[in-house]
Amino acid sequence: MSLYPLQRFESNDTVFSYTLNSKTELFNESRNNDKQHFTLQLIPNANANAKEIDNNNVEIINDLTGNTIVDNCVTTATSSNQLERRLSISDYRTENGNYYEYEFFGRRELNEPLFNNDIVENDDDIDLNNESDVLMVSDDELEVNERFSFLKQQPLDGLNRISSTNNLKNLEIHEFIIDPTENIDDELEDSFTTVPQSKKKVRDYFKLNIFGSSSSSNNNSNSLGCEPIQTENSSSQKMFKNRFFRSRKSTLIKSLPLEQENEVLINSGFDVSSNEESDESDHAIINPLKLVGNNKDISTQSIAKTTNPFKSGSDFKMIEPVSKFSNDSRKDLLAAISEPSSSPSPSAPSPSVQSSSSSHGLVVRKKTGSMQKTRGRKPSLIPDASKQFGCEFCDRRFKRQEHLKRHVRSLHMCEKPFTCHICNKNFSRSDNLNQHVKTHASL
């Protein structure tokens, strides 16, 4: 907005500036002038400052056509009653691209309020010539030594009526909160400790103490400043804690009869919603580990009550196992085993005795199939037609008969007919004896 709203006139006499304060006498004198040269008359505003007029650059261009053009450039000059100002870069309205603000350089008085109580939200209603309509804070006004005194001098009502979003944004940029308290020490301490709510860390909102009691969770929420979130999620936290976590408080499990324990387990498993309303719901929570133990105890007790074969007076009786062979057969088996080992001669027994003992042992072993030895190789699972000789005590099969006899003698009959002549140690196989004799030769 220029102080000289200029207008172009094509004339042979004069090009003049048309203003509201222009005088008709000058116009008449210029019309009556008979000279053939051009003159330019600029009538300054009565309220304009002489220094500001000298500083304004009004460029006059002669286009050599007989017309004098005054360049209508945008010159922003301030009046004498207005402070020096500049365009502000601290805050913008993103929704309005044509919005701009001025920022003043001058210093305010200490008693002058920082903001005007009458906030103007519309840009068209802002008077740039009026200092009270421009809602900006300069960098000089935020000095610590000079500008912290307006917090006490400004009334509380005026601060509460500040509803402009621009003012709140400006305050958040400089990171301080207006505190209208009277105590200076408390104010200085709070100025360094208090932080705006928008600056709070996001992780503080997720610090939900679901493991602690209700009193400790309330104290933690008050210290962290999460009161609204705590009130909204209190019911959900309580439900979550009651369903999935056990309390820290020691719960005493009383010894109850079997029927009452089953009722307690059923009620605690399905009636959780009824206990959510009361404060003593934490005591109703049962340790899951103890529930598993109780289930095992209940199962064992029920089995013992129903089918206990050792309890007197029950309907079921223990069936005694029947021996598959008599005592006489046991004696014969022991005698057959002890005969070859107790023989004093180192040589093998006679064929007649060996055949009789082996045949007798085979007969005995056929009756006692449950006394098999687990030592040795596992039975061959793949059937082989070449292995025609099968063991009668186990599922092993052999290609040669002597291998079958050696297997039965060593594993099933536990016979050791081969004795070392040096240390009198018995062996069931001749190859094992030969290896043993080599150990004596090395000595």
UniProtKB/Swiss-Prot annotation:
Gene3D superfamilies assigned: Classic Zinc Finger (3.30.160.60)
The keyword Calcium is assigned to this record: no
GO molecular function: cis-regulatory region sequence-specific DNA binding; DNA-binding transcription factor activity; DNA-binding transcription factor activity, RNA polymerase II-specific; zinc ion binding
Pfam family, one: zf-C2H2
One GO term (biological process): response to starvation
A GO cellular component entry from the record: nucleus
InterPro entries: STE12_transcription_factor, Znf_C2H2_sf, Znf_C2H2_type
Zn finger intervals (C2H2-type): 389-412, 418-440
Compositional bias per record (Low complexity), positions renumbered to this chain: 338-359
Keywords assigned: DNA-binding, Metal-binding, Nucleus, Repeat, Zinc, Zinc-finger
Basic residues: bias regions: 363-378
PROSITE patterns in the cross-refs: ZINC_FINGER_C2H2_1, ZINC_FINGER_C2H2_2
Protein name as annotated: Zinc finger protein YER130C
Phylogenetic classification of the source organism: Eukaryota, Fungi, Dikarya, Ascomycota, Saccharomycotina
